[in-house]
């Protein structure tokens, strides 16, 4: 009898002719997230990936596997040969463990998936036989409508017995949908946007704008911590840090006050566009949400997007703030995001920002600025570092 983690694959299993490539990517992600942890063989068998457990580090393996996109459920499982003696041994062991942890459980139900169609019994007959094993060894009852717990049996070449199915994040394996450059601030929204795009298989790197010394080094350390949190899901990432204070000063001197926010956003998009082109990114990602702040009106977003012909993904665009906060708490970025450090958007903040800008009007206001030079100078002072893929347990 062998202890394994059984990983259910969700969308990956629907990929038809490309399924093999997605499974390979997923196995690679699993291996990356389990580095520096003892474990046995990792293998694919009829729609699931299995990780052999070594020693007493099951909880550590579970915590790491929860961060792998493409996995829907994780089940601590006993793998045995497909014969009734070893199956009963596994069933008795796992039910005994379950009842010790949950003495309040009084009822159960068996669910069987018969992958080996050559096996002489059908799924209902197998479930009945396993149910008999439980009733013979424990003082509990069958309840097919509302049981306290399930005993699952996946019968393949070998047989897999489990009770718990721990929910993971699902999605697609990292790196199966291109590369994206995330505009990462210190707020609640942008880390969630990065998480959601990484969940769809995008390999996410981060671009952060600051206005040092008007913004502090502690503010940038906060953003680096958020980047590290994202990397726990997507692996090591590149962190670009760009000081836009000189750009903001030029905007403050030369442009109408009510247009400063939208013009600053356009410069951020210019910098992002240049970095994306120079480094082969397929898309730009932001945490913008329709109507949340002055620059996030339909007109404002249209004026911002006019800077680039790269696709700009805004995965939060129609979400309520409470839903965004729920995700931030779930992925452990919320507490860092609400730390009270200033960001570059608070520098030269207009009292009454323009809500309905036009491309023609904003381009007219930008005429006194040497946009290309300002962007080149900012990128010339850019700092780049690798962050994350931490060994957090």
Give the residues covered by each predicted segment:
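RNA-binding accessory domains that recognize and position tRNA/RNA substrates
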Residues: 1-181, 194-238, 306, 354, ...
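Active-site adenylate/phosphate-handling loop in enzymes that bind or generate adenylated species
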Residues: 132-134, 138, 171-177, 248-249, ...
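General small-molecule cofactor/ligand-binding pocket signal
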Residues: 143, 240-242, 313
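Cofactor-binding loop segments of dinucleotide-utilizing enzymes, especially the Rossmann-like FAD-
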Residues: 185, 209-211, 244, 288
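Hydrophobic/small residue at the entry helix of a nucleotide-binding pocket
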Residues: 188-189
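A conserved beta-strand->alpha-helix junction
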Residues: 227-253, 343
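A short alpha-helix-loop-beta-strand transition element characteristic
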Residues: 332-340
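The feature marks non-catalytic terminal segments
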Residues: 339-393
């Amino acid at each position: 009898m062998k202890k394994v983690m059984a990983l259910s694959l969700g969308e990956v299993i629907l990929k038809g002719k490309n399924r093999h490539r997605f499974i390979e990517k997923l196995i690679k992600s699993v291996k990356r997230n389990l580095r520096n942890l003892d474990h046995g063989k990792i293998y694919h068998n009829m729609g699931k990936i299995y990780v052999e457990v070594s020693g007493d580090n099951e909880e550590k393996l579970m915590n790491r596997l929860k961060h792998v996109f493409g996995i829907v459920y994780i089940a601590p499982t006993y793998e045995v040969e497909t014969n009734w003696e070893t199956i009963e041994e596994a069933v008795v062991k796992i039910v005994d463990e379950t009842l010790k942890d949950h003495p309040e459980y009084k009822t159960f139900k068996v669910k069987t998936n018969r992958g080996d169609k050559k096996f002489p019994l059908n799924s209902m007959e197998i479930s009945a036989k396993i149910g008999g094993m439980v009733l013979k060894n424990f003082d509990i009852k069958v309840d097919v409508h509302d049981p306290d717990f399930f005993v699952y049996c996946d019968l393949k070449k070998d047989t897999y017995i489990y009770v718990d199915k721990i929910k993971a994040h699902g999605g697609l394996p990292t790196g199966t949908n291109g590369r994206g450059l995330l505009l990462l601030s210190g707020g609640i929204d942008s880390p969630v946007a990065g998480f959601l795009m990484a969940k769809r298989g995008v390999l996410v790197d981060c671009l952060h704008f600051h206005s040092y010394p008007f913004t502090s080094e502690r503010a940038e350390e906060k953003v680096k911590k958020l980047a590290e949190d994202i990397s726990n899901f997507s692996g090591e990432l590149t962190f670009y840090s760009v000081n836009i204070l000189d750009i903001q000063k030029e905007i403050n001197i030369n442009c109408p006050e009510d247009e400063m926010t939208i013009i600053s956003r356009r410069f951020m998009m210019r910098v992002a566009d240049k970095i994306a082109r120079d480094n082969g990114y397929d898309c730009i990602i932001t945490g913008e949400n329709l109507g949340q702040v002055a620059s996030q009106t339909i007109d404002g977003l249209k004026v911002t997007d006019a800077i680039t012909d790269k696709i700009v993904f805004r995965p939060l665009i129609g979400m309520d703030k409470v839903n965004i906060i729920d995700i931030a708490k779930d992925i452990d970025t919320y507490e860092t995001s609400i730390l009270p450090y200033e960001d570059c958007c608070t520098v030269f903040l207009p009292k009454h920002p323009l809500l309905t800008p036009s491309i023609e009007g904003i381009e007219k206001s930008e005429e006194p600025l040497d946009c290309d030079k300002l962007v080149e100078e900012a990128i010339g002072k850019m700092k780049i570092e690798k962050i994350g893929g931490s060994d957090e347990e």
